[in-house]
Amino acid sequence: MKLTIGEHAGFCFGVRRAVLKAFECAEKQLPCVTLGPLIHNPQEVERLRRAGIRSVETLDEVKPGETVMIRSHGVTPDVYRQCEARGIPVIDATCPHVAHIHQLVRQYSEHGDAVVIVGEADHPEVVGIAGWARGRVFILPDAQAAEQAELPQKALVVAQTTIRRDRFDSVLQVLRRRVPDLTERITICAATSQRQQEAEKLSGEADVMVVVGGRNSSNTQKLLETCRLRCERSVLVETPEDVPPDLAEADDRVALTAGASTPLWLLEQVRARIEENAKTR
């Protein structure tokens, strides 16, 4: 069995930055909570919890003396206002790429542009981005939605940072035809594009493709979609225990990639389990 691990697998810059900030708080014994799970990976969230960093869903759950950490997905301006009004200290771990989108949205919407976000309406990053708009917001998950929407005459279009480029491009084609005055900003994260391109290449050359990551992670699910287009035997593995004993045959080419919220220690554990299973077959 030949095993290959993608060079771009695992934590992206924004997630790595947020996790480091959280563990720094734990080391300093600073009472700190994250507003929502810091990352979409249950194993890493549990590791943070054991270090003393718990997750809350609302500001009402924050105890006196605790600091709130904003996760890499970012939040709406209203969250910052509420924290200030309640006297809650904030550590802002919003990914700089996401923060840049916030500023674009605020700037263009203040000048009268509607805002089109290509992404998933219920994703926390998209919810946060939409909150920075001062006017009309359209959230379009795909080209079909773009065809059906009552679009404005003038708009800024941005992308959820983890959206697949082909999906963004398909929506963009519709917008170019239907929105006369369109400002385009391709805000897909470079790391996301690199990871997806690498996953395409690896899955096209592999007999078995393993995507390591949380089942609730949007970018992990998108990686799995990408891999399944080129490799029928593509599987999602959240923990080493999820690795099927009969995953691969002795002469199979196996490739691994991981979502942006997947820590390298977990990727290594999955790799070790695959190799261990191969030895016992």
Where is each model-derived feature located?
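The feature marks the mature, well-folded catalytic cores of soluble enzymes
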Residues: 1-281
